[in-house]
Regions:
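Conserved catalytic core of nucleotide polymerization and phosphodiester-bond processing enzymes
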Residues: 1-334
Length: 334
């Protein structure tokens, strides 16, 4: 069993108090000494991260619209890939979604999806499929398609990646793998164009740039298919990593300037982890998100946009799970 890190001052003797506080924000249950000694973890993750960067590194199209209108790509792609499944799944889940609802949603423009009364139940149904048996993990299939197709993966590698990531539980046929990837690329041809553009730039100039303007020099003797995936991914991955580095540095400067009793504990590519006193959690959360939500500019059309982020707090560095880890990292509702 792997070690789970806990925040300073937390012990099982205060578990019930901490659980209550996470639910309510009420600190009156703690003694003055506990308020001074117990720390809480604050973790801020980039929301969208590489996918958002890819959207603004593409010609403006439907992929970018997903982020503008707050539609999760995995859900949208799940709707499109498995449009023939959702009506029966809705019946089994005892939802009032009709076959006509599914048909209309699958044909609706991205900017109009939220106007359809059936959208909320449908998107929740799609997302919930991530926890279904492997043959019906439609959300998982869509998620892996999004992650892989953005970087030019081929069907055989895609099928093997899913098999490995699911520990052998999700097995796709060649036909399914090709269908998923071809459907995705038909939905978002701007992503195909981006890959082609990166190939051409790499061959012509042997240098790429991320959204902060920092270069990547290609030192391979030849720019061949073997390194295409690395080239497609570099701009988004390095931009995401640099956003976190900048946020980390700005937070440390703020802590020192304001003499805050906060500690930065981890930098994990697209997120960072802090701990702070219970009474500081809202200020710490707000600042941590502020530093992460940086302004960026599309190199394609100079459109300005912000990285988005989400914050979770808890008393150990592991996700919340009901009846298993109820003081784990979770979004606060107060």
């Amino acid at each position: 069993m792997r070690e789970i890190y806990i925040s300073d001052g937390y012990t099982n003797s205060v578990k019930d108090k901490c659980k209550y506080w996470l639910q309510t924000g009420d600190t009156s249950v703690f003694t003055e000494e506990e308020l001074n000694t117990i720390r809480v973890f604050v973790q801020v993750d980039q929301s969208g991260a590489e996918a958002l960067i890819v959207a603004y590194d593409c010609i403006a199209g439907d992929y970018r619209k997903l982020f503008i209108h707050g539609i999760k790509p995995h859900v949208y792609v799940g709707l499109k890939l498995f449009a023939d499944k959702w009506y029966q799944e809705a019946i089994d889940a005892r939802l009032t979604i009709t076959e006509d609802d599914i048909l209309r949603l699958s044909m609706t423009k991205i900017e109009d999806l939220k106007k359809n009364p059936a959208w909320t139940d449908t998107k929740n149904l799609i997302a919930s499929s991530d926890n279904w048996p492997s043959s019906r993990r439609y959300y998982y299939h869509a998620k892996q398609t999004c992650h892989s197709a953005n970087y030019g993966i081929e069907a055989s590698t895609f099928i093997m990646n899913i098999l490995e990531k699911s520990a052998g539980k999700v097995v796709l046929s060649r036909e399914q793998g090709e269908y998923f990837l071809n459907t995705y690329r038909a939905l978002f041809p701007e992503i195909v164009e981006r890959c082609q553009r990166i190939e051409e730039q790499a061959k012509k100039y042997r240098m790429l740039y991320n959204m902060f303007g920092f270069p990547y020099t290609i030192t391979s003797y030849e720019v061949t298919k073997n390194i295409y995936k690395e080239l497609y991914a570099w701009g988004a991955q390095s931009t995401v990593a640099e956003i976190t580095r900048i946020a980390y540095s700005r937070m440390q400067e703020f802590i020192e300037a304001e003499k805050k009793k906060w500690d930065i504990l981890a930098d994990t590519h697209d997120s960072y982890l802090l701990q702070c006193p219970l009474l500081d959690v809202k200020e710490c959360s707000t600042k941590a998100k502020e530093f992460m939500n940086q302004r960026l500019v599309s190199p394609i059309d100079n459109t300005e946009f912000n990285m988005k982020s989400e914050c979770n707090i808890g008393f150990n560095w592991s996700p919340f799970k009901k009846e298993v880890n109820e003081v784990g990292l979770q979004e606060i509702q107060w």
